[in-house]
Amino acid sequence: MDQKKDPSNNLTERRVSKVQRPNKKKVRNQVESLSRNLERNKEGQLLQTVSKGHLEADSGHSLGREKENGELGIRSIFYDKDWNPRGTAPSHYRNIPYNPATFKRRTEVQARLGNLENIKIPK
C-alpha cells in the first residue's frame, strides 16, 4: 500500500479524518465545557454589573487617590463624615485605605471619664 494513501501514516489525513468523524465522547465533553464556561461568564458579568452599581451609588465620595495630597475619601482610615469628609491624612502621616478585615476592632471601647462621669456619651 502506498504511504500517502494510508491514513495511519499520513498526519494530514489523520487530522482530516478526526474532523470528519469526531469522537462522540470528546464532542460531548467539549459542549459541556463550553456550556460551563458560558455560565461562569454570565455570573461574572452579573457581578461586574452589581459592582458598577455600587460604584455609581458611592459616586459622591472619592474612591481613589486624588491630586497629590493623598486624599482617599470614604476609603481612608482617617475618614469621618463630620470632621474629615475628604479623608485627608494628617501632616507627616501616610494615608492608608480602610480594610475592614485588617482594622477590625477586637475589643470594645470603655470610656474612662474620671471625675467627669456626669457627661453624657453619644451612642
Curated annotation (Swiss-Prot):
Residues 1-16 have a biased composition (Basic and acidic residues). Its main location: cytoplasm. Residues 17-28 have a biased composition (Basic residues). Keywords: Cytoplasm. Coiled coil: none annotated. Disruption phenotype: Increases frequency of mitochondrial genome loss and sensitivity to freeze-thaw stress and high concentrations of glucose. Residues 1-42 are annotated as: Disordered. Pfam families: NpwBP (PF12622). May interact with the nuclear pore complex. Belongs to the AIM4 family. This is Altered inheritance of mitochondria protein 4. The lineage of its organism: Eukaryota, Fungi, Dikarya, Ascomycota, Saccharomycotina.
